[in-house]
C-alpha cells in the first residue's frame, strides 16, 4: 500500500516544495526477502522536480509528481527496493529522464537490470538542480559501497538532507549484509554529514 504524498516543507523562496510519498514492497538480498517501506522524495517547484528513490510503486509516484516535468531521478544507492521500479517509472515519464546513481553500486544495479543502460554516475561533491533547488551529492558508503546523500543547504531554516538508507531515525543505516560495513558507515557519516 502506498500512502498519500504529504508536503513536508514549503520554502517560499522560489516556490519550492519537498513532498514525501511512502511506498511499500520487498527488499531482496543475500537470499532473504523483507517487506519494507521506502520514502520517495519529490523536490522542486510546481513546474519541475527531481524524484529521489522512486521505490516500489511507479504509478503512485507518477501520480504524486502530477503534471511536473521530472528533470532527474536520483538514487541514494543500488539496493533493489530503491531501484527495481526505476525503469518502469522512467518509461512512464517518456523514457528520456536521466537516472543518476553512484557507480560504486553498479553490481547491485546489474543484479536487477542485467541488460540495458546503466545510470549516469554520481560523484562526491557533484552539484545538481532539482527544479530551482541546489543539491550537493555527498558520498556516504557503508550501507552499500555507493551510498550517497543529497544535501539541499538552502532549503528551510537549516538545510535538508535526503539520506536514503544511510541514516535512520535514531542512528546509522543498516549494515550486516553483503557490501555493507558498520565501520565505513560511521566514518562516512562523521566525514560527510557531521563535520
Q: Locations of the language-model features?
A:
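Short acidic-hydrophobic surface loop/beta-edge motif
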Residues: 7-12, 21, 43, 124-130
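Divalent metal-coordination and catalytic microenvironments
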Residues: 43, 53, 77, 89, ...
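Metallo-beta-lactamase
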Residues: 49, 145-195
Amino acid at each position: 500500500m502506498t500512502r498519500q504524498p504529504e508536503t513536508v516543507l514549503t520554502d517560499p523562496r522560489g516556490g519550492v516544495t519537498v513532498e514525501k510519498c511512502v511506498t511499500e514492497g520487498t527488499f531482496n538480498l543475500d537470499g532473504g526477502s523483507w517487506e519494507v517501506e521506502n520514502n520517495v522524495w519529490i523536490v522542486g517547484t510546481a513546474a519541475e522536480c527531481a524524484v529521489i528513490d522512486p521505490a516500489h510503486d511507479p504509478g503512485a509516484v507518477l501520480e504524486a509528481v502530477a503534471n511536473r516535468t521530472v528533470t532527474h531521478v536520483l538514487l541514494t544507492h543500488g539496493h533493489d527496493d530503491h531501484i527495481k521500479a526505476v525503469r518502469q517509472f522512467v518509461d512512464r515519464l517518456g523514457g528520456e529522464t536521466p537516472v543518476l546513481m553512484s557507480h560504486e553500486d553498479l553490481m547491485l544495479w546489474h543484479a536487477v537490470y542485467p541488460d540495458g543502460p546503466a545510470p549516469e554516475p554520481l560523484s562526491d561533491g557533484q552539484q545538481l538542480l532539482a527544479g530551482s533547488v541546489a543539491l550537493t551529492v555527498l558520498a556516504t558508503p557503508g550501507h552499500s559501497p555507493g551510498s550517497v546523500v543529497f544535501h539541499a543547504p538552502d532549503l528551510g531554516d537549516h538545510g535538508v538532507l535526503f539520506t536514503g538508507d544511510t541514516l535512520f531515525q535514531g542512528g546509522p543505516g543498516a549494515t550486516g549484509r553483503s557490501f555493507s560495513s558498520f565501520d565505513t558507515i560511521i566514518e562516512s557519516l562523521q566525514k560527510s554529514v557531521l563535520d
